[in-house]
Amino acid sequence: MRSPKVKFLTIFTFCIFITKMSFASNSCSNEAGTMFRIEPNLIKAIALVESNLKKDSIGKNRDKNNNIKSLDYWLMQINQMHIPLLKKRGIIKDERDLLDNPCLNIKIGTEILYNHFSRCGVTWQCLGTYNAGFAMDNQKKRQQYAPKYILYIPGLMN
């Protein structure tokens, strides 16, 4: 059984980590929003919906047979399909960079969202492509995905 002191230190450390993450997320979301002309509250909402701000979260995308077909990394759940281009551009060395640097993850995710908006317009349907992609058979998934942000944005506006 842990002593009260150890429990306190564990909780204290966790609180500092969450506070640090929150400040980093706010600062980085604001910076990324300015860089790509996207509302910072939307960026924060995406991070909340995608990863629930869970450190080192790696999403596993599965096919109909439950086989892993791709991975998504941390805050903005950057899909592994982006890794080769990010390496080629010198932005990352490997996927670990997406897990170790929250600001970098937020900026890359925001750039991906910017590219989606440039392709299909600033609409809720286009926002759904951030998670579900552009495939025609993902139409229903896109429509279900975008409204999830609406739940988070009002609380972020305060």
From Swiss-Prot:
Signal in keyword set: yes
Entry keyword annotation includes Signal: yes
Record's signal peptide: 1-24
GO cellular component, one term: periplasmic space
Lineage: superkingdom: Bacteria
Keywords: Periplasm, Signal
Subcellular location: Periplasm
Transmembrane segments: none
Main subcellular localisation: periplasm
UniProt similarity note: Belongs to the IagB/IpgF/P19 family.
Name listed for the protein in its UniProt record: Putative peptidoglycan-binding-like protein
Organism: Escherichia coli (strain K12)
Lineage of source species: Bacteria, Pseudomonadati, Pseudomonadota, Gammaproteobacteria, Enterobacterales
Primary gene name: pbl
